[in-house]
Amino acid sequence: EEARKNPILASVPIIVMTGSERQEYEAKCLELGASDFVPKPYNQRVVKARINSVIKLKESAAALSAIEYDDLTGLYTKSAFYYHAGVLMRYKPDQSYAVIMADVKNFKLINNIYGIRVGDDILRYLAKTVNKVLTDGLVARYSDDQFVILTSMPKNDFEKQMENVVRYISENAPISNLLVKYGVYKDVDKSISISEICDRAIMAMKSIQLNYEKNIAYYDDQLGQQHIREVMMENDFENALRNEEFEVWFQPKYNVQTEKIAGAEALIRWRKQDGSMVSPGAFIPLFERDGLITRLDEYVFKKVCEIQKERLTQGKPFFPISINLSRASLHHEGLVENYTRIVRENNIPFECVPIELTESAAMYSIQIKALVDMLVASGFKLHMDDFGTGFSSLTSLNVLPFDVIKLDKSLVDYIGNESGDQIIQHVIALAHGLNMKVVAEGVEKKEQAAFLQNMNCDQIQGYYYSSPKSYEVF
């Protein structure tokens, strides 16, 4: 009974050997999960035969439990794939194999827009099509919106064949613009576990999740080294937070007309204890993927609130310091209550710490609308960051109470181009018509600053005036 309570021993076959002839003992042991019961006197050949029989039954049961099919797609499940892939590679050790991981991008959004039935149709379509075009492949549904394929490597043109498969799947999809990302691990190392082989294909796939130009990525040693570095950064996160290795830097925002500082944006930098700096481009996307960004967002928010409290206590001039809020933080439970409490504990006006939401994070939905309304009701001012990079800008401006929009650098870069000038002129006019201020970010040239001044842009942020500075320098 105690053995069955132990998760390590729960699946181990148990044969009870006893000198008791009482049948109730035998019945009780079998009820508790014993695989067999051997009374005295022991016959060596009988005991050995029964042990072998129990082992074979256990192995057969394990194989049967692994051979399970996904109800929706009819494909193998993840556990079944692990089992059969291992058997196949052991059966043909001289064959070269590739593992392909396929991920349906924005699958939750597809379900929300088209409905769950269409989402299910897409999954069934992918299952059927992959089986059709990869006839020698072992295919499984790996997770809700991911598929895994083990296929033998052709001697030539594997990458070309892979491109043809991807094109066929895309062109025959049940909805237009279906986006599937593929991670491929070629010539798999058979000395490592099936799960690790799949992990390498997943690494490749994740490396292009934000790259809209590329749908196929291949695992290589460089990607493996990058994964090791990312794991080390994740492992270092707790100590870095505890030891305050994360520093808040500031990039000033300048009043276009007076050319004086009118505010700043808080940015994060990571200075390790040995003095080396970790690039934000390395750790921020990583922490956004694994969810650690929510704690980093709160860390920055607390630091800025403390700085604003110190400035106000010392009688220094007031100006707002905006804080970026990630998509993950926006959906984090208790966000409004927590951030409101931090502001009140520092006894500062909410106007001191406006919140910047990227255009993609603020993409309109009922949930986002409710959350934004709660932030505004608490007293926060909201800025739309990266305006012009997404497709929901006008909808968001119409229904969400933003006070400021920040023109993305990609728009500013087109200043001097006739159509680019027209777009910026009309966006500024639109924002002012909605009683919103406009901040242009990424301004690097005198000509850009002069144009924005003529267009009555409110504030400028960029290297033309100042790069991000540490707090002491700022």
Report residues per predicted region.
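C-di-GMP signaling machinery
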Residues: S60, S79, Y91, I194, ...
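GGDEF/GGEEF active-site signature
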Residues: Y125-D189, E196
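A short glycine-enriched loop-to-beta-strand structural element that forms part of the catalytic core
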Residues: A98, D144-Q146, L150, P174-I208, ...
